[in-house]
Regions:
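Short aromatic/hydrophobic "clamp" motif used to bind/position activated sugar donors
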Residues: 111, 349-351, 355
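A recurrent flexible, glycine/aromatic-enriched loop bordering the glycosyltransferase active site
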Residues: 168-170, 181-200, 378, 396-413
Length: 443
């Protein structure tokens, strides 16, 4: 196994290798215009507290705009002079659409999302927007602490008044940030630790990612779905633990509700169909969009294609395999996972230079799994006899490569995959289906 970097990097570039935001810990940017988008529905007291706290931010006031995005409250929210209000009709829980509406009205280079019931400390905005100002791909998530603010005056300094009334912080979230080094060690499943109540990113990257999915019309999940797409588009995830905002009341998981499990199940089922990565999607059902697409070279004969495709689907049962042999060979074309046409947007594409037989799936599965992390973008696959078999590349690396002419910020890894061998033009099909014979039967 060997590894090589792609491109040369210095700390004045607008990207970092992998997810290495820590390489910019020493840099403070020149302030840029920031738009704070406060999502609101029928919480006038909480909104007033949050807007008061935003007026006390230590970020340059002339570069800070505040937009309240109202999700159809019964009464029009009252906002102070200088705060812009945008509203949409009440058609259920549509926080995703409300946030997008706020973005449409925004003029800032950096977007900072808050919920109306989540009140920031005075240095919150400055700390949240540091990385997105330096790195257009940065997505930062602050620390959402919880307190009972019901008896706290609206104009009380939140940093002094909230700690005495603090409620339990979600342990799963706190522990995840600790394990990952504040998301420095992020991967394909780290979207679960990005919450829209305390979120910031550049306007440019938000637009490139497509914004929030407005089809979400019930509580929860729209921020995770966006964060998944953002990561796949090349986001650099960072938790900023000293950017603190206080949520009025307990975490959702800590509330007493007989419907909480049902709501959680609805969210998980919805996301399972939208996020086709291991640990998030169904374990056996075919995903709506494949996580892995394997592409065979053109002109592979039916026998070789059969052995190759069948062995690949043993290793990756939910992958899509692309081969022009599917047009002619009924035994291949009748499987919905096999196609003659390549897809246009999958998480990982494995391009084979030669047809292969996978006699031991585990080494190949481990090699492809490396692409779930942040640092490696391409894996070159070599057989035990030194034959170059092909290469796998992540969508994340491809998106960054297109974005930056100087490179994609990922490493390339060369892996010898034991148990995977090149297939000759007429492999012994009976040996394959019967499960007998070694690699020489298929060469």
């Amino acid at each position: 196994m060997s590894e090589s970097p792609t491109g040369v990097w210095n700390d004045r570039m607008p990207w970092v290798p992998g997810n290495r935001w820590d390489l910019l810990a020493h840099r403070e940017p020149e302030p840029v215009r920031v738009s704070v988008i406060v999502t609101h529905y029928d919480q006038p007291v909480e909104l007033a507290r949050t807007l008061f706290a935003l007026a006390l931010q230590d970020y340059p006031a002339g570069l800070l705009e505040v937009i309240v995005a109202d999700d159809g409250s019964p009464d029009e929210p009252v906002v102070p002079a200088g705060v812009r209000l945008v509203r949409q009709d009440d058609r259920g829980f549509r926080a995703a659409a409300a946030r997008n509406l706020g973005v449409e009205a925004a003029t800032g280079e950096v977007l900072c999302f808050l919920d109306a019931d989540t009140t920031p400390e005075p240095d919150y905005v400055r700390k949240m927007v540091r990385l997105p100002t330096l790195l257009p791909e940065a997505v930062t998530v602050g620390r959402r602490r919880h307190a009972d603010l019901s008896e706290v005056p609206l104009d009380a300094p939140i940093a002094e008044s909230a700690p005495a009334r603090e409620l339990d912080e979600p342990a799963w979230l706190r522990d995840a940030y600790a394990r990952s080094g504040n998301l420095l060690d992020a991967d394909d499943r780290s979207y679960r630790y990005v919450i829209s109540a305390v979120l910031a990113c550049s306007r440019r990257f938000f637009a490139e990612s497509g914004g929030f999915d407005e089809s979400f019309s019930s509580y929860g999940g729209e921020d995770w779905e966006w964060a998944h797409r953002a990561w796949q588009a090349g986001a650099v995830f960072a938790h900023v633990p000293d950017a603190v905002a206080w949520h009025d009341g307990p975490d959702w998981a800590g509330r007493e509700s007989g419907d909480r499990r049902r709501a959680g199940n609805e969210q998980t089922l919805r996301l399972a169909s939208l996020i086709p990565v291991d640990g998030s999607s169904a374990r056996g059902l075919l995903p709506t969009a494949p996580d892995l697409e394997v592409r065979l070279p053109a002109g592979v004969g039916t026998a070789a294609a059969f052995v190759c495709v069948d062995s690949l689907l043993v290793a990756f049962p939910r992958a899509r395999v692309v081969t022009d042999a599917a047009r002619e060979a009924e035994v291949l074309g009748q499987d919905p996972r096999v196609s003659a046409e390549a897809g246009d947007d999958v998480r990982v594409v494995l391009e084979l230079r030669v047809p292969v037989v996978v006699l031991d799936p585990e080494p190949l599965v481990r090699a492809i799994a490396v692409l779930s992390g942040a640092s490696v973008g391409t894996v070159e696959l070599v057989s035990p006899d030194g034959t170059t078999l092909g290469h796998a590349v992540s969508r994340r690396a491809l998106r960054r490569r297109r974005r930056w002419d100087m490179g994609d910020g990922h490493h390339s890894l060369t892996v010898t995959v034991d148990g995977v061998h090149a297939v000759g033009p007429e492999p012994h099909v009976e040996a394959w289906v019967g499960g007998w014979g070694g690699a020489d039967r298929f060469a």
